[in-house]
Design a protein with these regions (language model features):
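Generic C-terminal helix-cap and adjacent flexible tail
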Residues: 142-156
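A short, structured loop/turn motif at beta-sheet edges
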Residues: 14, 66-71, 93-102
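Short beta-strand segments that buttress and anchor functional surface loops
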Residues: 49-56, 75-81
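Beta-strand/loop substructures that line and gate deep hydrophobic ligand-binding cavities in soluble
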Residues: 80-134, 151-152
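Short, surface-exposed coil-to-beta transition loops
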Residues: 3-5, 59-63, 86-90
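Short, charged/polar surface micro-motifs in flexible loops or helix N-caps
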Residues: 57-61, 67-74, 84
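Generic structural detector for well-ordered beta-strands
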Residues: 7-11, 38, 52-54, 64, ...
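Hydrophobic ligand-binding cavity/cleft-lining segments
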Residues: 1-40, 139, 155-156
Length: 156
């Protein structure tokens, strides 16, 4: 199993960050790799809620909420995808800090394909995933600080 940790600061109230995280469809606004996100079913929040994400340049993933602390933390897991993983799950937390918000995430996953998957993870996947999440968190912070919900420039 591989773990990836992130911590960033947003110069805005924590509730602004939480509003973006708690709206499961808002990921399409701050994640540059998501073309469109939609809640599946009637449940829009809390443990058991699901969202599907159409990805750029192609692909689709379905995620399920596994952890919910209103105003503070949301955890998700990949429920369906064609990625070469046995599982991927994460918890993102928001805490007040110095007049702003500290955002932390702990993500863990297991790559398929035994020793070959382990090697692929060490050589490519962890580095690529970390870089992707760096971009996601930078965009999340920009959106939270500006209060914007518009799509990143150049997105369709």
């Amino acid at each position: 199993m591989t773990t990836v940790q992130h911590q960033v600061f947003a110069a805005c109230p924590p509730d602004r960050v939480w509003a973006l995280l708690a709206d499961l469809e808002a990921v399409q606004h701050y994640n540059p790799g998501v073309r469109h996100a939609a809640v599946e079913g009637a449940q829009r929040s809390g443990v058991g809620a699901r969202r599907s994400c159409d990805l750029l340049p192609k692909g689709r993933v379905v995620e399920r909420v596994t952890h919910w602390e209103d105003g503070r933390a949301v955890g998700l897991e990949v429920a369906e995808s064609d990625w070469p993983i046995h599982f991927m799950r994460w918890v993102t937390r928001v805490e007040p800090q110095g007049g702003g918000a500290c955002i932390t995430q702990s993500l863990e996953y297991q790559v398929k394909f035994g020793p070959l998957g382990w090697l692929l993870d060490r050589l490519v996947m962890k580095r690529k995933l970390t870089a992707t999440l760096d971009a996601v968190f930078a965009s999340l912070v920009r959106h939270a600080e500006s209060g914007a919900a518009s799509r990143p420039e150049g997105r369709t």
